[in-house]
Amino acid sequence: MKKVVVLGGGTGLSVLLRGLKLFPLDITAIVSVADDGSSTGKLRQEFNIPAVGDLRNVLVSLSEVEPLVEQLLQYRFHTSSDLNNHAMGNLLLTALYNITGSLTKSLESLSKILNIKGKILPFTEDKAILVAHTKDNETIIGESKITKAGKKIDYIEYEHEVKVTDQALEAVKKADLIVFS
């Protein structure tokens, strides 16, 4: 079976994986953990954790469970409390991260529960923050601010050096095909 590694964030990566899982492939998704918007952004600030939202979306896309379970993971609370706009799957990943101390271990646990087709790995266990440098020499910190700015980007980097997980590096080395989404 061909080993396919797909690297990316939540939206594009999730759509691609929904299609790829229909083929006889050994899929590994390596997911960015630099998201800082919405529920993920709040959880990052509150619990000092890496981003979990894109991981949640990838878990749902590779899962082979009842549609109700997918709906549960994607469910967002609509309330006037602190839970407002939090995704249930993000809360679950945050709890597992606090229990295991590792995104990789959290994903391994949820992958078993959700009958995941393939493997999901975080790009890093570090708290990655994106920094964009624009064509007009502006510096924008944070993925959500970069998106909202609508500026022409010269280059992007992390605010500080991050360590790629050993599992992600190993998956890339063993891949027959690498896809960027």
Model-derived features: positions:
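Glycine-rich beta-strand-to-loop/alpha-helix junction loops that act as flexible
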Residues: 8-11, 181
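An anion/phosphate-binding loop that grips the pyrophosphate of nucleotide cofactors and donors
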Residues: 175
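Electropositive, gly/pro-rich neighborhoods at or near active sites that engage anionic ligands
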Residues: 34-151
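Active-site glycine-rich loop that binds ribose-phosphate moieties when present
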Residues: 155-169
